[in-house]
Amino acid sequence: MSRKSKKIKKKVFKDSKYNSQVIAKFVNRMMFDGKKSISETIVYNSIDMLAEKIEEVDKIAAFNKALDNVKPLVEVRSRRVGGATYQVPVEVREERREALAMKWIISAARKASGKSMQEKLANEFVNSYNSTGAAFKKREDTHRMAEANRAFTHYRW
């Protein structure tokens, strides 16, 4: 049994514009050097651009669908058994799914060249909404790795 106490999860408040906890988490993950107002502006404008590009009335629904399309269901974790290290496929918890999806979308937008961050993030949202783009590719690669190592599922812990 672990001697460590359970980590207390920090409560994330809902964002001011859409009253959504998921968008608030996304804003926090986008933030650099504690500059939340800049991060909020970028995220809100890119959500507006997303709704504009796909002609969606409900902006939050469009954002959530883009995020859901990138969430991974399984991932591989290293497990050492008798001197050999195996990549064991493991199901991903819901909180981690959300965190990975956000991380992948943001990193894909940051890697894109040219344009402003708002446009790059909006394009990545559109790509995620349409199940294409770098973030979706990352999800597919993760699933492919898990599928390739399916033989080692009995090493799960």
Swiss-Prot record:
Q: Does the keyword Cell inner membrane apply?
A: no
Quaternary context: Part of the 30S ribosomal subunit. Contacts proteins S9 and S11.
Q: What is this protein called?
A: Small ribosomal subunit protein uS7
**GO cellular component terms attached to this protein's record:** small ribosomal subunit
Name the Gene Ontology biological process terms: translation
Recorded family membership: Belongs to the universal ribosomal protein uS7 family.
Give the UniProt keywords, A-Z.
Ribonucleoprotein, Ribosomal protein, RNA-binding, rRNA-binding, tRNA-binding
**Per its UniProt record, what Pfam families does this chain match?**
Ribosomal_S7
Example GO molecular function = structural constituent of ribosome
Q: What is the stated purpose of this protein?
A: One of the primary rRNA binding proteins, it binds directly to 16S rRNA where it nucleates assembly of the head domain of the 30S subunit. Is located at the subunit interface close to the decoding center, probably blocks exit of the E-site tRNA.
Species source reads Borrelia hermsii (strain HS1 / DAH)
